């Protein structure tokens, strides 16, 4: 209704501001530790069934980033020197001479899919360092990569992840806002292009039905008893879990191995910088400005070399005075 009248837009804007205010602006300052001047979250190893870390009290993996107002909340997160003990309220400038450093895996789930499926087209795309979503769009629309428009690339990205996680024509049509028949055509073209991915997904489901569980790269198991359920709805949900878990669980394996190796190297190198947060596929550190270059190289090497895969891992580095600036 937003395009039809200003009132619905105003209501939605108010809800966004009210949510940001109640969840973050009014709440987080009261959670700052009185002695350290910092927020101290808990990271939970055994909450998410995929093996990913979750965060609580407060949840620092859920700080908004997708809207301009949400990014203003991230601007409040600033670095502080190790050992800072002065009392400091939230939402004030950080320690002078210190910065935040973000290290974010690029397309980690698609890269893991390429490794697990051994699909030639996907493996080649990552090996050549090309834009996988643009390459998919080129194949789906039958046009040269340089002719792919941004809307076409965005559609291809949605198809890449939709098919990866078992989305059918109806769900993809709703996501893209296109007719179901067109979505079915996209899915059919994707399956023809990436036959190795489809074969891997079929093998994964077959093995899950046989064994009752699926495994990650490091052989962690997730049991999925509902995959043998007599209920079609329960079975369909279990099949989605069987497809999701090896990908998301392997991503969790990868970043945890990287974190352990990074911690070892930080201690061995006597860096003043340190790891602060893990936010899904991203690590956030703080360090003195004069350590940035060395630390960025160390972090990238530890993350990209955490596990040996058939495709290269790529880590994007960002540096800034606050959490908003590093993206």
Model-flagged regions — what are they?
Residues 1-327:
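Conserved catalytic core of nucleotide polymerization and phosphodiester-bond processing enzymes
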């Amino acid at each position: 209704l937003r395009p039809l009248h200003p009132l619905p837009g105003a209501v939605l804007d108010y809800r966004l501001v009210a949510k940001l205010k109640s969840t973050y602006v009014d709440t987080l300052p009261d959670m700052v530790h009185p002695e350290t001047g910092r927020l101290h979250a808990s990271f939970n190893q055994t909450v998410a069934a995929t093996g990913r870390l979750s965060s609580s009290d407060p949840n620092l993996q859920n700080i908004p980033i997708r809207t301009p107002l949400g990014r203003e909340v991230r601007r409040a997160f600033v670095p502080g020197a190790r050992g800072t003990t002065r009392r400091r309220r939230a939402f004030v400038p950080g320690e002078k001479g210190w910065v935040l450093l973000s290290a974010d895996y690029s397309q980690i789930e698609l890269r893991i899919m390429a490794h697990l499926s051994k699909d030639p087209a996907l493996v080649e795309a990552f090996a050549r360092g090309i834009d996988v979503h643009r390459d998919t769009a080129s194949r789906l629309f039958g046009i040269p990569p340089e002719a792919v428009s941004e809307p076409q690339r965005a559609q291809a990205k949605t198809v890449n992840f939709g098919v990866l996680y078992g989305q059918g024509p109806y769900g993809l049509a709703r996501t893209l806002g296109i007719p179901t028949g067109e979505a079915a055509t996209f899915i059919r073209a994707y399956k023809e292009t990436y036959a190795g991915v489809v074969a891997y997904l079929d093998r994964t489901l077959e093995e899950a039905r046989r064994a009752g569980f699926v495994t990650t790269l490091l052989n962690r198991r997730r049991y999925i008893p509902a995959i043998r359920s007599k209920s079609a709805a329960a079975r369909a949900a279990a099949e989605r879990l069987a497809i999701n878990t090896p990908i998301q669980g392997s991503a969790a394996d990868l970043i945890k191995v990287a974190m352990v190796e990074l911690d070892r190297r930080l201690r061995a190198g006597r860096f003043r910088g340190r790891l602060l947060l893990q936010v899904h596929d991203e690590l956030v550190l703080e360090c003195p400005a004069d350590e940035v270059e060395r630390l960025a190289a160390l972090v990238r090497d530890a993350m990209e070399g955490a596990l040996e895969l058939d495709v290269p891992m790529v880590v994007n580095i960002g540096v800034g005075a606050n959490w908003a600036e590093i993206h």
